Amino acid sequence: MSEAALVPPALSTNQTEETFNFQQYELLRQDRAAHLGPGITDLASLKERIRSYYAIESLADHLNSHAEYRSITLQFPDDLLFDSALVAEELQALLPDLQCARTDAPAQADTTCSCGTQKTCADSKDSADGRKIWILADTAYSPCCVDEVAAEHVQADVVVHFGDTCLNPVETLPVVYIFGEPYLDRAKVISLFTERYDKDAKVCLMANAPYSRHLESLSGELSQLGYSNLVFTDVALPDTPNAAATILGVSDSHPISHKLYASGDRVYYGAKEQLLCEEQLQSFELFHIGLPPDPRLLFLSTKFQGVTAYDTQKRQIAKGPFPAMMRRYRFMHVARTASTIGILVNTLSLKSTRSLISSLVELIRSCGKKHYMFVVGKPNVAKLANFEPVDVWCVLGCGHGGIVLDHANEFYKPIVTPYELTLALAPELSWTGAWVVDFNTVIDGISADLGLQAGAIPAENVPEFDAVTGKYVGNSRPLRELNHLEIESPQESITTGSTELVKKFSGALTIGSTVSTSAQFLQARQWTGLGSDFNAEDSYEEEGATVEEGLSGVARGYQYDVSNAEHTDADVPKTSGRVMNT
């Protein structure tokens, strides 16, 4: 047999090296007009706008002044992720020792280093000791928070956070915040503002962190048009900041304005020198530039008389739907009569997360309720639907964008905040309409509630009225009389079966004066498993299972479905007449 006969036939068409070349990523095709503005025609103008928007030079100077920052992580939100490669490239050009560390292969003694210098990589620092840049994509939790979990995977020394942020204090890593310099159509904003408000209206100008740089000049232009009752806000680190937090590219000086009030990460300024308080803000309308996340929007709706949001992407007033406070009040009533509470941890980087978890667990136990704890990155409907025994969820997340509000009614079980849970578990449910998202404030409130419950006389095991269903619930506090299970059974009472105790307690809902919510939930299910270890009379065959015919057909119409449909059609009386297709 010849060698030609041993060659297998070709199973595909002719392929060359060009066939396997990946499609090149075209930078100019991305629509960056929303944040970089119009006028980008070539790669040079794009890089110049990138350097200005992300304050690359200021960032490089800050990193060069901290030689201890060797592993640098850049965190981008999803809407700015396509700029990450250009930002890393421009930053590398200003960090000389970093390029030597990223050399793909060791250079020879007679060659030039890939960084462009005349020194060889053999004479420079080892690549393991040089600086490295990492890009953090697909953050574990809300993009406004610093992703310490992802940064620890690469042993980061510093996190550079770009875009909108909540400025919540983090536990360990130093943080550098760069909001950016987004483009704003000022003429469009002023036109929509004048159409909506009268000149004597009391309006507060607020924006997401990147757009806050436009508020002072925008307030000055509106004042020239006759609006005299205006205040605006600017971003600032909270009163209890992280000592290693730094904001670059933002000036905190306002020479022509007066500081009126400070609350959280916002400082209020105005042209008139007067003092404001939280009660006086209730008389102001809020004009917000940029569509804030739902938790932030709900929080602002409790602080001002009304909220109007300007969508910077569509360049129009956002029309909703917006989250409502009435749904929060209903969810609190559900949590009041819930027997099992799921603590959903939606952040691990906030400074008071662990303290809040401990306080919530202590509060839930003191109220006689069961709890489970879950750590889920970016919770969705499918993830939480796997835990049916949970009656209500308590989400621990950032108040800016880490709280799941479910205003579209997609989740199977209600989701409440720690503050709402503390109100629901109080002896008397009373709510002033305030919506607190600060962890430290909630912890102080839980400590006060535990102090009141310690001196109170425990109530008897009486049913509790459910305001949602209008019925009485008898097992809302299953651990109210928590006793350890002690079983004493004499040897002579034990039969030959080794599962006698299981038989005795398998159908019981109360064991040792303690309500078993798991047993109650299991008995309420239509399907309880593939079989029983102790019930010998329940479809048990010693010689083996009988082979039975299973389902047949496709998923859209199994055989028994087809039979039922035919049977139903046969029962429907037929009518005479002609059907016209329109």
Curated annotation (Swiss-Prot):
It is found in: Cytoplasm. Pfam families: Diphthamide_syn. [4Fe-4S] cluster binds at C145, C166, C398. Its cofactor is [4Fe-4S] cluster. Its main location: cytoplasm. The keyword Zinc-finger does not apply. Binds 1 [4Fe-4S] cluster per subunit. The cluster facilitates the reduction of the catalytic iron-sulfur cluster in the DPH1 subunit. GO terms for biological process: protein histidyl modification to diphthamide. GO terms for cellular component: 2-(3-amino-3-carboxypropyl)histidine synthase complex; cytoplasm. InterPro entries: DHP2, DPH1/DPH2, DPH1/DPH2_1, DPH1/DPH2_3. Transmembrane segments: none annotated. GO terms for molecular function: 2-(3-amino-3-carboxypropyl)histidine synthase activity; 4 iron, 4 sulfur cluster binding; metal ion binding. It comes from the Eukaryota. Keywords: Cytoplasm, Iron, Iron-sulfur, Metal-binding. Pathway: Protein modification; peptidyl-diphthamide biosynthesis. Belongs to the DPH1/DPH2 family. DPH2 subfamily. Component of the 2-(3-amino-3-carboxypropyl)histidine synthase complex composed of DPH1, DPH2, DPH3 and a NADH-dependent reductase, predominantly CBR1. Required for the first step of diphthamide biosynthesis, a post-translational modification of histidine which occurs in elongation factor 2. DPH1 and DPH2 transfer a 3-amino-3-carboxypropyl (ACP) group from S-adenosyl-L-methionine (SAM) to a histidine residue, the reaction is assisted by a reduction system comprising DPH3 and a NADH-dependent reductase, predominantly CBR1. Facilitates the reduction of the catalytic iron-sulfur cluster found in the DPH1 subunit. This is 2-(3-amino-3-carboxypropyl)histidine synthase subunit 2. The gene is DPH2.
